Amino acid sequence: MPEDRPIEDSPPIGEAQTDAPAGGCPAGFGRIKPPVAGGSNRDWWPNQLNLKILQKNPDVINPLDEDFDYRSAVQNLDVDALRADIVEVMHTSQDWWPADFGHYGPLFIRMAWHAAGTYRVSDGRGGAGAGMQRFAPLNSWPDNASLDKARRLLWPVKKKYGKNLSWADLIVYAGNVALEDMGFRTAGFAFGREDRWEPEEDVYWGPEQEWLDDKRYTGERDLENPLAAVQMGLIYVNPEGPNGNPDPQASAIDIRETFGRMAMNDVETAALIVGGHTFGKTHGNGDASLVGPEPEAAPLEEVGLGWRNPQGTGVGKDAITSGLEVTWTHTPTKWDNSFLEILYGNEWELTKSPAGANQWKPKDNGWANSVPLAHEDGKTHPSMLTSDLALRVDPIYEQITRRWLDHPEELAEEFAKAWFKLLHRDMGPVTRYLGPEVPKDTWLWQDNIPAGNDLSDDEVAKLKELIADSGLTVSQLVSTAWKAASTFRSSDLRGGANGGRIRLQPQLGWEANEPDELAQVVRKYEEIQKASGINVSFADLVVLGGNVGVEKAAKAAGFDVTVPFTPGRGDATQEETDVDSFAYLEPKADGFRNYLGKGSDLPAEFKLIDRANLLGLSAPEMTTLVGGLRVLDVNHGGTKHGVLTDKPGALTTDFFVNLLDMSTAWKPSPADDGTYIGTDRATGSPKWTGTRVDLVFASNSQLRALAEVYAEDDSKEKFVKDFVAAWTKVMDADRFDVA
């Protein structure tokens, strides 16, 4: 993170800096309308549901061959040769962007840090796992200024290894190699991140419309969820201090909040700051207001680069990235303990960078002429950021870092672990880690699951019979499997039924999981598990039970189906489960079961789309699951909202048929609780009740089109088939151990 303050006075997001006259439109500049007729639907109806997020990364935009499998290809990578090529790049300074101190390592560390550091634990979004730093908005965030050059420096490496090395892997591996080349011993590295080919449109980065604006706080300093940065376009905190106020203690509050929101504790936070700021420098040797537009707003001739600096050479000693001009240590390309030695070896006074940014220098000319200049002979004094001094003034951070001052080996160990966590937090379980540098050590945050057992066809058949005869209802079987599997997040590949954590805390006590009823079902499954004499995991039993429920429901609707089942799930223990970390997976809403928790900040139908998105579902898959789960009577609390059938427990198309029936008139409930009453249009007698999630399948034009398909007379068998396919997709979403 050696460069983490954005350029001030940036234009509004998406708007280029230009001298175009009012009303004029010089070619390639200004705010021009794309070649489409009129505004988009979103312009006309800004509150419209965005179903496009349910069709992310379609195959049609992927230029690679249909049968190409990156996770297989990357295992053929010559990692030693790749490492050597990255090292050569780091030591070969280019005139178009000269290396600070003759080494691009610190720049690559910052690139990797800022790629991974967008991760946030609340919804699992962000992170380095898909190479999103290449695309807007991240490629143009003020905090990512000059990282366009870092990626461009690595293009010859990417070009050489082609499709066998993703940008997502290369960006973070280059940072890892940089640390090791400068003398640090990392904990290892895992390959396996697959590139995507379009920006992520489903990530909420904040309400602001201008870079560095701050409209995300309420109260004294309450940061809006799920955000994990203090201003639009920053990765974490403003290194000058909150909103530029150079108050180290206030900065410590922001640091703890933002790093905590990306799953780092105090020790990990301190280690990342100290370790990252052991290397390199920041850039602010000039007037930051003169720097050109970011890559997405830059003219075509910049060929994807941005932030052109017209002052002096514009690069090297004249470079401007953050507006801060700080070199922390006298050995900026070597791992040592000098950052802490300098931080605690001086008293500090506030000063200004050449760009006018708040930073700190030693009092009384301390450590004068001890820090090298990056691009010319001579030396200067060290400098610090407000966020650096926070480590010294905050009592908790001070206790941690003062110990490291005397025990640098402990700092090295903690930084290695925290850096590995930073780069791999969004990769999912260790079964997804690939390559020769995967560490043997495992950590609690990886949500580790012991290997499960295979089951024979006869064993599966016996277990299904025991479940069917257990007295558990279709609703109990299906809802329990859904509660377990639907915790899965495609964003960071956490959650899911594997591990059997539905029987453990915190999931066993979640309000959304109806703890009293869930405890009864868990006990029944444990009885079956013991009585069967079969070495079956609790996790497998829950999914198999859900399948039994679906098969029963299909038979009640007149169809004999066998729901696909792949055994092999393992059972985690309570000791292998980080209760605090898993708490972030607790559903605040689950439209599939008509559950809406207290204090929801969005209408229920928007929450449904978000949950379907995290589950990796398409709009048709979401539609079939909602319609099917309604008639299977699995609503939270046993409510009858949306159970539009007189045959609950049968997998029929009744939800769609009755929802679209024009003999029913709907109106809001007098209770004003977000529910609706459906009455007979002729007699006025009540027929049904529903929620916003139910009625949206008749109200939204796209969802209605899907609902109509399943309401048609010839769709009964198709619906059962489609429901089973979507159900199986959710049940197996976390099965990274099988093809």
Swiss-Prot record:
Q: Name one GO biological process term.
A: hydrogen peroxide catabolic process
Site location (Transition state stabilizer): 110
E.C. number(s) listed in UniProt: 1.11.1.21
* Gene Ontology MF annotations: catalase activity; heme binding; metal ion binding
What does UniProt give as GO cellular component? cytosol
Gene3D superfamilies from the xrefs? 1.10.520.10, Peroxidase, domain 2
Which portions of the sequence form the region Disordered?
1-33
Provide the residue positions that the database annotates as binding heme b: 277
The cofactor named in the record is: heme b
> Would you identify the family this protein belongs to, as annotated?
Belongs to the peroxidase family. Peroxidase/catalase subfamily.
The protein in question is named: Catalase-peroxidase 1
- Which species is the source of this protein? Mycolicibacterium smegmatis (strain ATCC 700084 / mc(2)155) (Mycobacterium smegmatis)
Encoding gene (name): katG1
